[in-house]
Amino acid sequence: MKIFLENLYHSDCYFLPIRDNQQVLVGVELITHFSSEDGTVRIPTSRVIAQLTEEQHWQLFSEQLELLKSCQHFFIQHKLFAWLNLTPQVATLLLERDNYAGELLKYPFIELLINENYPHLNEGKDNRGLLSLSQVYPLVLGNLGAGNSTMKAVFDGLFTRVMLDKSFIQQQITHRSFEPFIRAIQAQISPCCNCIIAGGIDTAEILAQITPFDFHALQGCLWPAVPINQITTLVQR
């Protein structure tokens, strides 16, 4: 996708791996970077997303969906899930247009990722749009603990998977109270979702500290993102 702000930028997609405690690949998050045409300038993705029109939101989502479709045999063969970021604009289109929704439902390995800053997340199942989405698609909360919402949507069972925010993990792990605190969180949200993931696993030291807590999966800079042409390297040990 190409977009013009003060300059012309193009999008590049990468697969950010998600691994279990044995470092076996269980899924990926599809992330997008925006760079200038010559590749010398990168602009924050959040800044680009904030300036997209509804049509551009869907264009970007469609391009990401096409990329995942091109790799579907890889995901099916290795029994992996793939997270695709869901913006409110795309959510509206999925709810209002059956042809858009039907296309996505063809690929059950795709899960839709939202963050705590998603509009009206605090309403939980009282948010009719979010409830409707959760009844049709697997939803993932990507940054629990970022401090932008309550846990009502989690307790209402709207998410298939919940990932603890990377900054939350990295800040709390230095405290003596980390173990009882994390175990209390796990006990609270385990009945509400199928999978709890720890983000922010950026070093071997953090990995060693987090492993005893038996999270279902882990994500962080310890396992860097790869471009689409290197996706098969993610399952090589």
Swiss-Prot record:
If researchers knock out this gene, what phenotype do they report? A double sdiA/ydiV deletion mutant leads to decreased cAMP levels which inhibits quorum sensing system 2. Repressed by glucose. Unlike the case in Salmonella typhimurium, disruption has no effect on motility or FliC levels.
Annotated EAL domain residues: 1-237
One Pfam entry for this protein is: EAL
Query: What are the alphabetically sorted keywords of the record?
Result: Repressor, Transcription, Transcription regulation
What InterPro entries does UniProt report for this protein, alphabetically?
Answer: Cyclic-di-GMP_PDE-like, EAL_dom, EAL_sf
Q: What does the record note about the induction of this protein?
A: Induced by extracellular autoinducer AI-1 (Vibrio fischeri autoinducer oxoC6), in an SdiA-dependent fashion. Repressed by glucose. Induced at pH 5.0 in an RpoS-dependent fashion. Very poorly expressed in both rich and nutrient-poor medium due to inefficient translation (at protein level).
Keyword Transcription regulation tagged? yes
Single GO MF descriptor: cyclic-guanylate-specific phosphodiesterase activity
Q: Which Gene3D superfamilies match?
A: EAL domain
A cellular component annotation (GO) from this entry: plasma membrane
One example of a Gene Ontology biological process annotation? regulation of single-species biofilm formation
| Function summary | Upon overexpression acts as a novel anti-FlhC(2)FlhD(4) factor, decreasing its DNA-binding activity, able to negatively regulate expression of flagellar class II operons including FliC.
Q: Which PANTHER family match?
A: ANTI-FLHC(2)FLHD(4) FACTOR YDIV-RELATED (PTHR33121:SF69), CYCLIC DI-GMP PHOSPHODIESTERASE PDEF (PTHR33121)
Q: What family does this belong to? A: Belongs to the YdiV family.
Q: What is this protein called in UniProt? A: Putative anti-FlhC(2)FlhD(4) factor YdiV
**Highest classification ranks of the organism:** Bacteria, Pseudomonadati, Pseudomonadota, Gammaproteobacteria, Enterobacterales
